[in-house]
A protein has these predicted regions:
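Structured alpha-helical segments in the cores of large, soluble enzyme domains
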Residues: 25-27, 189-194
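N-terminal basic, low-complexity leaders that serve as flexible interaction/assembly modules and, when applicable
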Residues: 1-96
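Active-site-proximal, glycine-rich beta->alpha crossover segments in alpha/beta enzymes
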Residues: 2-11, 88-192
């Protein structure tokens, strides 16, 4: 709940603004209103591997920033880890991405044989649980938006994160393998959303 002092032609005084209601009002009235809606996001590399730490960092950052909409910036590499990547989390608070020692997709055959994961996958289940806790914390007060990449972005993250050339080459050389991977990742996303 946010308290703001303000004076406008329409009213003056102190009002209590709840992020959810203020954003809803702005959408319905198609106006910005008397206050700018605030949100942001930030990777928490030191908190990513530990669910409680990640939850606390997200809540504390949103509180300090006086955010109206809570953007969950999940561990950037949870999907590769869910698919078995050998990944070492960052120990540098200024560098969100860690070090990959192996990737789940290294060739077209890996892409073609990529399975769909379900919500019982321990990595996906942990992400869902943290998101659930954050949503529960702000339920009815502020909207919460979690990050979920599209399947094509996941292909890149599972093969060569931050370097699109490998994925672009797969599009050109083996589109069938790419389509199979996209289908598996779409099913995984659907299970994750449920």
């Amino acid at each position: 709940i946010i308290r703001r002092e303000f004076t406008t032609e329409r009213m003056e005084g102190t009002v209590v603004i709840e992020g959810y209601n203020e954003i809803k009002r702005m959408v319905e009235e198609k106006t910005l209103g008397d206050k700018l809606t605030i949100t942001g996001w930030y990777h928490f590399p030191l908190a990513d591997p530990v669910a409680d730490d990640f939850y606390n960092e997200t809540i504390d950052t949103a509180k300090q920033g006086d955010w109206d909409l809570i953007k969950i910036m999940t561990c950037g590499n949870y999907m590769p880890v869910a698919y078995g990547a050998d990944y070492e989390f960052s120990t540098n608070p200024e560098k969100w991405d860690g070090v990959f020692h192996s990737h789940p997709i290294t060739c077209a055959e890996d892409a073609a044989n990529l399975p769909a994961l379900d919500a019982t996958n321990p990595t996906l289940a942990a992400e869902v649980e943290v998101d659930r806790r954050i949503v529960e914390t702000y339920k009815g007060k502020k909207p919460v938006l979690a990050t979920l990449f599209d399947p094509l972005s996941w292909v890149q993250e599972l093969s060569t994160p931050m370097e699109p050339e490998w994925t672009l080459n797969l599009m050109r050389t083996d589109p069938e393998a790419l389509l199979k991977a996209l289908d598996a990742l779409e099913k995984t996303n659907d299970a994750f959303l449920d």
